[in-house]
């Protein structure tokens, strides 16, 4: 009997803790906070993401072509998960 009361109390406390920071609206359901937004609040713009990836690829190409940077190349290859044996600069590939 005591175990049943303890389990019920524990489940109730967990439910209250999860729902406490949320609000309910009949058309949207449960949402974190008072209002829901259709688009994500925090995201990268596509042009910014493209520029950052281009900068990373250019730097990796520079490191691959520089004989003094050979020690860092295997880590970068694992990071980018693709073959980085570039023979021409990225701008010339297009």
UniProtKB/Swiss-Prot annotation:
UniProt keywords, alphabetically: Cleavage on pair of basic residues, Neuropeptide, Secreted, Signal
BP term (GO), one: neuropeptide signaling pathway
An example molecular function term from Gene Ontology annotations: hormone activity
Site entry (Cleavage), positions: 34-35
Any one GO cellular component localisation term in the record: extracellular region
Keyword Transferase: no
Pfam family, one: Adipokin_hormo
Signal peptide, first to last residue: 1-21
Protein name, per record: Prepro-gonadotropin-releasing hormone-like protein
Organism per entry: Ruditapes philippinarum
């Amino acid at each position: 009997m005591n175990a049943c009361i303890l389990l019920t109390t524990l489940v109730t406390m967990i439910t209250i803790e999860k729902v406490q920071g949320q609000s309910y609206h009949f058309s949207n359901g449960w949402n974190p906070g008072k209002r829901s937004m259709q688009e994500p609040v925090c995201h990268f713009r596509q042009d910014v993401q493209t520029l950052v990836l281009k900068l990373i690829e250019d730097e990796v190409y520079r490191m691959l072509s520089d004989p003094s940077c050979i020690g860092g190349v295997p880590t970068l290859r694992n990071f980018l998960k693709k073959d980085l044996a570039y023979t021409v600069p990225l701008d010339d590939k297009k």
